């Protein structure tokens, strides 16, 4: 694990950060589905630069861990 940071950010901005992280996570999940099943998950799907479905799934999982960590910290500070 790398160095930990404490960042102060407005709740609206934090919501935008989480939305962006969720979009990236979904994109990588969709890439894993496409690479594994040769199936387009939705009409706006754009495949990430990856050729290994396991790697794409690991990247999606990494985004999920980041999102979960941020959400836990929000909860620890009293929620939205």
Language-model-derived ranges and their functions:
Residues 1-80:
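Positively charged, low-complexity terminal tracts
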């Amino acid at each position: 694990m790398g160095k930990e940071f404490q960042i102060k950010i407005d709740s609206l901005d934090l919501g935008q950060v989480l939305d962006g992280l969720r979009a990236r996570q979904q994109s990588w999940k969709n890439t894993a589905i496409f690479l594994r099943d040769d199936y387009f998950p939705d009409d706006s799907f754009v495949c990430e630069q990856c050729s290994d479905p396991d790697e794409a799934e690991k990247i999606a999982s990494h985004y999920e861990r980041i999102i979960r960590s941020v959400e836990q910290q929000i909860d620890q500070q009293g929620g939205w």
